[in-house]
Amino acid sequence: MSTDLSVTVIILNWNGKELTIECLESLEKVNYSNFNILVVDNGSTDRSVDALKEKFPEVSILALERNLGFSGGNNRGFDSLKPGPPEFVIFLNNDTIVDENFIEPLVKQLLTNKHVSQTVPKIYYENDPKLIWYAGGIVNLWAGSIYHLGIRQYDGPEYSKTHKTKYATGCCFCMRYDEFKEFGGFDETFPMYSEDVDLSLWVRAAGKQVWFVPDSKIWHKVSASLGGAFSYGKMVRKARGLFLLIKKHANPIQWVTIIICSPFLLLVNIIKYFRLRYFGS
């Protein structure tokens, strides 16, 4: 039974105790029999650690002295699991609410095929529970673009099939402990954004696969931990992460096509930004 296999859920917190409390409350309802939770506090100054220890005394907390970013914080959490590590790890954003059945389908898909290295749930917007945020990921190094399949579309049969995909979003994914260690964890030159794509590109380059598993479901309060979906800070971090990704993975010919495509993509993204911010669609 897949529910007998040990799983640790790693959650990163930075000055987001209310979000983390709601996430942990949803995890309390999960019906998987053999899982633990590790909260990594990334140098919070809002007394998150005290609040979480008081409300969830059974949850392990790793308190870091300073903010090491998404990659660094998650890597320190992962490193703290030894000795006696779990068989699987799930990295989960603190601004999420999980379905009670979300763990088993992710583990089960990893067990069906030794070539599967990452599994990802179907992710909805929390404020519109049937509106999809992630149903697979696309990476196009020829155009320098990354996007989610199904984003801002209402759920339907076309988003209910298990399938291979290009990358696992860092919002939530599951891997074997040994494989995450083998791939070296998240690259800490990516403080936030595109580190998840970078990891999946290495996974696929090694001949492994990334699978979207719609039987696993979670809901995402998109960018709540960063002050909103349209914050200036988020846009800057995303642009920097994408540049680092292209610098690391694109070949010389792809650099040429990216430069050609960039003005068009910039215009599309500006239009999309204003449309979503001011018209909501």
Map each language-model feature to its residues.
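Conserved donor NDP-sugar-binding/catalytic core segment of glycosyltransferases
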Residues: 87, 96-134, 139-141
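Conserved donor nucleotide-binding strand/loop of the catalytic core
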Residues: 49-84
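Short, flexible, basic/aromatic active-site loop/helix in glycosyltransferases
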Residues: 139-166
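Short, acidic, metal-binding catalytic loop of nucleotide-sugar glycosyltransferases
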Residues: 25-34
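A short, conserved alpha-helix in the catalytic core of glycosyltransferases
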Residues: 166-217
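Non-catalytic, C-terminal membrane-associated alpha-helical segments of glycosyltransferases
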Residues: 231-281
